[in-house]
Amino acid sequence: MSLLTEVETYVLSIVPSGPLKAEIAQRLEDVFAGKNTDLEALMEWLKTRPILSPLTKGILGFVFTLTVPSERGLQRRRFVQNALSGNGDPNNMDRAVKLYKKLKREITFHGAKEVALSYSTGALASCMGLIYNRMGTVTTEVAFGLVCATCEQIADSQHRSHRQMVTTTNPLIRHENRMVLASTTAKTMEQVAGSSEQAAEAMEVASKARQMVQAMRTIGTHPSSSAGLKDDLLENLQAYQKRMGVQMQRFK
């Protein structure tokens, strides 16, 4: 796996799924391929994206700044500086300085990532802030190692939180989660189906599923009533794709 592929993988792992994720992936690909060289426009676009957390925006801004060639005097962006300030916690800043000194001695991406992984997310963000604000310099490889270590920590905590929700025994949370997933799957079916004649059936199934979820939420139903709802939808979607000659992995 090439360095840039690895960076793209780690960065995208912390972006919530949805159309915006696809857009960000495309921007990253363009930047890494040298196709997008307007850093100013890129940062303005990033600043106004909805849904993304300030830290995710800060990390993406840091990656764009590292990768896109720019004039030396180009102004640093406030939204990135704020996100990479470690919440103003002096402990984070102290640790960030210690980490920075260690990173100065590293020359490889993997070496930097290993060193960085033993620090907290706040310290890692502050260290990125030091480099972003030109208060310290490291090689691009080392900076990318720092980025990937930060993303790995964030993705780990997101995964733990997701696993807790999936394995929760609270029937109300499980019920709501199944309905949310069914609704999202139905939306995806409508997008995948397109406008061909064969798509009508898939669209109808998706539409009925969304109506059912709406009705279940409106009248309030027994927590077990949503069981299998998403799986039924996925089976319908796969059957439709088979008829269309499209093979797509299950997105359970």
Swiss-Prot record:
- Quote the SUPFAM superfamilies the UniProt record gives: Influenza virus matrix protein M1 (SSF48145)
Which region ranges are annotated with the description Membrane-binding? 1-164
Its BP terms in the Gene Ontology are: viral budding from plasma membrane
Major location category of this protein: virion
Which GO MF terms does the UniProt record name? RNA binding; structural constituent of virion
Q: How does it sit in the membrane?
A: Peripheral membrane protein
Task: List the subcellular locations.
Answer: Virion membrane; Host nucleus
Give the location of motif Nuclear localization signal in residue numbers. Answer: 101-105
Checking Pfam families in the record gives: Flu_M1, Flu_M1_C
- Top-rank taxon: Viruses
Query: Listed GO cellular component terms?
Result: host cell nucleus; membrane; virion membrane
Task: Identify the keywords attached in UniProt to this record, alphabetized.
Answer: Host nucleus, Membrane, RNA-binding, Viral matrix protein, Virion
Q: Where is this region: RNP-binding?
A: 165-252
- Keyword RNA-binding appears in the UniProt entry: yes
Q: What does the sequence similarity comment in the record state about its family?
A: Belongs to the influenza viruses Matrix protein M1 family.
Q: What else is known?
A: Most abundant protein in virion. When expressed alone can form virus-like particles in transfected cells.
Question: How does this protein assemble?
Answer: Homodimer and homomultimer. Interacts with NEP. Binds ribonucleocapsid by both interacting with genomic RNA and NP protein. May interact with HA and NA. Cannot bind NP without genomic RNA.
Function as written in the Swiss-Prot or TrEMBL entry: Plays critical roles in virus replication, from virus entry and uncoating to assembly and budding of the virus particle. M1 binding to ribonucleocapsids (RNPs) in nucleus seems to inhibit viral transcription. Interaction of viral NEP with M1-RNP is thought to promote nuclear export of the complex, which is targeted to the virion assembly site at the apical plasma membrane in polarized epithelial cells. Interactions with NA and HA may bring M1, a non-raft-associated protein, into lipid rafts. Forms a continuous shell on the inner side of the lipid bilayer in virion, where it binds the RNP. Determines the virion's shape: spherical or filamentous. Clinical isolates of influenza are characterized by the presence of significant proportion of filamentous virions, whereas after multiple passage on eggs or cell culture, virions have only spherical morphology. Filamentous virions are thought to be important to infect neighboring cells, and spherical virions more suited to spread through aerosol between hosts organisms.
**What HAMAP family does the entry give?**
INFV_M1
In its UniProt entry, what is this protein called? Matrix protein 1
Q: What organism is recorded for this protein?
A: Influenza A virus (strain A/Equine/Kentucky/2/1986 H3N8)
